[in-house]
Amino acid sequence: MLPEQQQQLISLIQAAVASVLPDAQAQVLLERPKVAAHGDVATNIAMQLAKPARRNPRELAQGIVDALMAETAARALVENAEIAGPGFINFRITAAARQAVIQAVAEQGEAYGHAPATGEKVLVEFVSANPTGPLHVGHARQAALGDAICRLYAATGRDVTREFYYNDAGNQIQNLAVSVQARARGIAPDSPDYPADGYKGDYIVDIAQDFIARKTLQAADGAAVTASGDVDNLDDIRVFAVAYLRREQDLDLQAFGLAFDNYYLESSLYTSGRVEQTVQALVAKGHTYEQDGALWLRTTELGTGDDKDRVMRKSEGGYTYFVPDVAYHKAKWERGFRHAVNIQGSDHHGTVARVRAGLQALEEGIPKDYPAYVLHKMVKVMRGGEEVKISKRAGSYVTLRDLIDWVGRDAVRYFLIQRRADTEFVFDIDLALSKSDENPVYYIQYAHARICSMIANAGADDARIAQADTALLTAPTEFALMQRLASFPQIVAQAAQELAPHHIAFWLRDCASDFHAWYNAERVLVDDEPLKLARLRLAATTRQVLANGLALLGVSAPQRM
């Protein structure tokens, strides 16, 4: 059912309940029966009300049904209503109500499944890689999840900002600089003179060569940087190496079809004084204490679930890594983002309570669950039945660029979204390359391309198809397909609410399956011209909604394959 049809049916049921039990107070909820033969939607409202009303639930259900079906508006929407089990009411909607989705999609087009603008600002931070190497498969999963979540937020009316937080401060940047310096001096990774914690991928050689050649380069949001070529100047090497890798990451993200609205540098939190100001504010508010020469935050007293207090400033000096995180998220709040989402690897689980505790200590008005988190698990890449662990470019891990080069952007995006973020995932390269029904990307895109080909070969112009009589669409597989198309707006809303784009991936696979089942059961290009046009109209409707769903995942909808 379309969302507006569901709301209409809920209102009609509420009116029927009021006529049977004038003083009753209960929320009417509709759900799809687990067995399709039981109906299209069902409610347990009679079971909710039976005990407080001291009524038999089945008898109460019958009274509600009688009152409901006495209304003309209800009969236009509901073909029949049956009592099942202890008091469920199962509804089967009319053919006209099923067919209404075709006109709805025709009127809304690319906006079908979308909601009006709410004006709510949302900041989604994701990828946020250290500028110390190419983006790996974990970053790839973040990129796919993050961009899809942003698209879902936009589809549900939010004003979305995509942000990349660069971890450009700390020991890893120093390790990068000395690694490039060693390579620039001709020291190989297998040499005892190579830095013990140095990076060893081929990209370090590329940086060293460009530094010596005094190349000029520019990241997406930064000023141009020209290498000095002075291999003894570690600061120059560090600045150039960071700029080089930021540019490389930008290029990888461009190849993935992803553009960020804003870049935020961790180093700016120190140069602007935000980190020190944050610490001073926490001390002034009485949420810290000194012990063993270190400064501690009383995180256990701040109601965010942390099981022990945390060190902020180490006894030997320097802040722990969660302190700049607190300063950064306070900045998000001050920038007006009352809704913020972080997409990170599951190894960041321990930081959630600490960051939230720091925010609680800084400002009472910040909700305890701010920011929201989507924590994803690892991705294992398989090829030929064996795990792929090594990339020549990165040296020790498979990169985002590797995946794009091997299977293409569409497959990478879909495969990395199709499972819940909190589950480990095996990326099967062979499956992603296969042209079979087992490959979900191929299966869905083939359905779209098949429809394009079918309509092109039908010899009917768009105007005639658009005016076709949908009342002729009464086959069971047609009803099933229309029901699937009508469910799309609810799936979009659910996926956005739960920050779970895999719901869209599942829905697309199911929709393609329903389309193929209909296509195989009912000839579309029949001799009966009105029926042919009606079926072409259903096919065109399916094509539009498939394209809308694929767009939410950042996946293309090809016209031919």
Curated annotation (Swiss-Prot):
Domain of life of the source: Bacteria
Catalytic reaction(s) noted: tRNA(Arg) + L-arginine + ATP = L-arginyl-tRNA(Arg) + AMP + diphosphate
Taxon lineage: Bacteria, Pseudomonadati, Pseudomonadota, Betaproteobacteria, Burkholderiales
Chief site of localization: cytoplasm
Entry's EC annotation: 6.1.1.19
Matches recorded under SUPFAM superfamilies: Anticodon-binding domain of a subclass of class I aminoacyl-tRNA synthetases, Arginyl-tRNA synthetase (ArgRS), N-terminal 'additional' domain, Nucleotidylyl transferase
Keyword presence, Ligase: yes
Species of the source: Bordetella petrii (strain ATCC BAA-461 / DSM 12804 / CCUG 43448)
Keyword presence, Cytoplasm: yes
Protein name listed in UniProt: Arginine--tRNA ligase
Subunit structure: Monomer.
Matches recorded under PANTHER family: ARGININE--TRNA LIGASE, CYTOPLASMIC, ARGINYL-TRNA SYNTHETASE
Keywords per UniProt: Aminoacyl-tRNA synthetase, ATP-binding, Cytoplasm, Ligase, Nucleotide-binding, Protein biosynthesis
SMART domains in the cross-refs: Arg_tRNA_synt_N, DALR_1
Family from the record: Belongs to the class-I aminoacyl-tRNA synthetase family.
InterPro entries on file: aa-tRNA-synth_I_CS, Arg-tRNA-ligase, Arg-tRNA-synth_N, Arg-tRNA-synth_N_sf, ArgRS_core, DALR_anticod-bd, Rossmann-like_a/b/a_fold, tRNAsynth_Ia_anticodon-bd
